[in-house]
C-alpha cells in the first residue's frame, strides 16, 4: 500500500515545478480553496491524486482566538500535505494579526 508520505518522498526526488516565497512546489495542480469541502480527508485524497498544494477551509479569526475546538479541526493537516495554506478571515485588522500569529505556531 502506498502511503501519502511515500508518494511525497518519490515526488520530491524531482526538481520543483515552481516556488511560492521560497517554498518548493512539486507539480502543476493546486487544490482550490473550497469552504465546506477542503477538510483533511479531501485534501489528502487530492494530494494522493496529484495536487501539489492545498488550502484549508476558511476559519473566522474570532473562533481561532477563542481557542474553541472547531478551528483546530478545520486547520488540521498531516506533515505529508506540505505545503498547506491556512485561510483565515475577519474584519478587524488587529484580530486578523493576532489570529495569524496564533496559527503561525502550527507551521503551515
Language model segments and positions:
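Glycine-rich, positively charged N-terminal anion/phosphate-binding segment
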Residues: 7-19, 34-108
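An anion-binding catalytic pocket shared by soluble metabolic enzymes
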Residues: 31
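N-terminal, post-signal-peptide segments of secreted/periplasmic proteins
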Residues: 22-23
